[in-house]
């Protein structure tokens, strides 16, 4: 999930499904069908914001399919393919202490426990065993390398300071 001001991207419309205007959705929520808990969406497509209501949805195989209000034709549905699905950030459930949404970690400056700047969290990857921070170099970092750092709280990630916009990791800069 990525955040843009007061909205968070929770998924993307990927393709049409069937002939009655249903759409396939790639969900960024965990669990994947958590996207169905949000009824009022804002779609961002080609720079345009489109408010729309989720009428119904369900798991279909490995993915999610949805029917949006007012869309009951395959060709009309096709025009929404590629749209980002956004919801107001305030609608996201509050997480327990020490847990974070990905969008909260993106943009944090990353420092080693020794105080060396490794760069800034650009995005995260879901690998199955653990999530991975993709850290891009910045003007103040020790070098210009991109780093992949496992997101393992208490093992690798020692501190997350959202207010200070920084993260401290126990990580060898040579990796």
UniProtKB/Swiss-Prot annotation:
One of its GO terms (biological process) is ribosomal small subunit biogenesis. It is found in: Cytoplasm. It holds the Pfam family RimM. SUPFAM superfamilies: PRC-barrel domain (SSF50346), Translation proteins (SSF50447). InterPro entries: PRC-brl_dom (IPR027275), PRC_barrel-like_sf (IPR011033), RimM (IPR011961), RimM_N (IPR002676), RimM_N_sf (IPR036976), Transl_B-barrel_sf (IPR009000). Keywords: Chaperone, Cytoplasm, Ribosome biogenesis, rRNA processing. GO terms for cellular component: cytoplasm; ribosome. One of its GO terms (molecular function) is ribosome binding. Signal peptide: none annotated. Residues 97-175 form the PRC barrel domain. PANTHER family: RIBOSOME MATURATION FACTOR RIMM (PTHR33692:SF1). An accessory protein needed during the final step in the assembly of 30S ribosomal subunit, possibly for assembly of the head region. Essential for efficient processing of 16S rRNA. May be needed both before and after RbfA during the maturation of 16S rRNA. It has affinity for free ribosomal 30S subunits but not for 70S ribosomes. The PRC barrel domain binds ribosomal protein uS19. Binds ribosomal protein uS19. Belongs to the RimM family. This is Ribosome maturation factor RimM. It comes from Marinobacter nauticus (strain ATCC 700491 / DSM 11845 / VT8) (Marinobacter aquaeolei).
